UniProtKB/Swiss-Prot annotation:
It catalyses: 7-carboxy-7-deazaguanine + NH4(+) + ATP = 7-cyano-7-deazaguanine + ADP + phosphate + H2O + H(+). This is 7-cyano-7-deazaguanine synthase. The keyword Ribonucleoprotein does not apply. ATP binds at residues 8-18. Catalyzes the ATP-dependent conversion of 7-carboxy-7-deazaguanine (CDG) to 7-cyano-7-deazaguanine (preQ(0)). Pathway: Purine metabolism; 7-cyano-7-deazaguanine biosynthesis. The gene is queC. The lineage of its organism: Bacteria, Pseudomonadati, Pseudomonadota, Gammaproteobacteria, Methylococcales.
Length: 223
């Protein structure tokens, strides 16, 4: 099996991405990040999911994006909104996917892997600029210009299997692949036990996705 690095947050989208990469026959090395986010529940979920979904290795990288703040997810002084916002919301973490993909790229070089999977989505999403197809294309170009592998003739590919799927379609896909979505944590403001707030944008999209998919939502909500 070809090796691949799969970014795994512990949420619904990244779990589905890992399951898809496994279905496609990749030997998956899962990578998660403790980046100073509000809660650690998603990292606990990521560890469980990596094992459940058959990753051959799971690495958690510690980076301090809370040192620069600028996001409701890394700065406790900024409240997580309980309603949709116009424009790019305060839950956007500056340069997060650029940083995450850079670490994934470095690990891929070490592993001899040319494939990186990330669960970004540009349909039912919060409007983050680093989830758009044009960002992924630009990063893939960077990856092939800025690495020893690229200079020596190899070619990295950034896989985004969810990019054009609705949340409902993502849930249907993952359910067909046997994912237990009760194990995932998507909420921006989950508590230590992984209970979801039920009102943030991520909870709203998740609830809407299960409803539109016609599948019972296993999420434990506080409200």
């Amino acid at each position: 099996m070809k090796p691949a690095v799969v970014l795994l947050s512990g949420g619904l989208d990244s779990a589905t991405t890992l399951a898809i990469a496994r279905r496609e026959g990749f030997a998956c090395h899962a990578m998660s990040f403790d980046y100073g986010q509000r809660h650690g529940a998603e990292l606990k979920a990521a560890r469980r999911l990596a094992q459940s979904l058959g990753a051959i290795e799971h690495k958690t990288v510690h980076i301090g994006l809370d040192a620069i703040g600028g996001s409701a997810l890394t700065d406790l002084r900024i409240a997580v909104p309980d309603h949709p916002q116009n424009g790019i919301p305060v839950t956007y973490v500056p340069a997060r996917n650029t940083v995450f993909l850079s670490f994934a790229l470095g690990w891929a070089e070490v592993l001899g892997a040319l494939d990186i999977f990330i669960g970004v989505n540009a349909v039912d999403y919060s409007g983050y600029p680093d989830c758009r197809p044009e960002f992924i294309r630009a990063f893939e170009q960077l990856a092939n210009l800025a690495t020893k592998v690229g200079v020596e003739g190899g070619r990295f590919r950034i896989h985004t299997p969810l990019i054009d799927l609705s949340k409902a379609d993502i849930i249907r896909t993952g359910t067909a692949l046997g994912i237990d979505y009760a194990m995932t944590v998507s909420c921006y403001a989950a508590d230590a036990e992984g209970l979801a707030c039920g009102v943030c944008d991520s909870c709203r999209l998740r609830r809407q996705g299960f409803e539109q998919a016609g599948i019972a939502d296993p999420t434990r909500y506080r409200s």
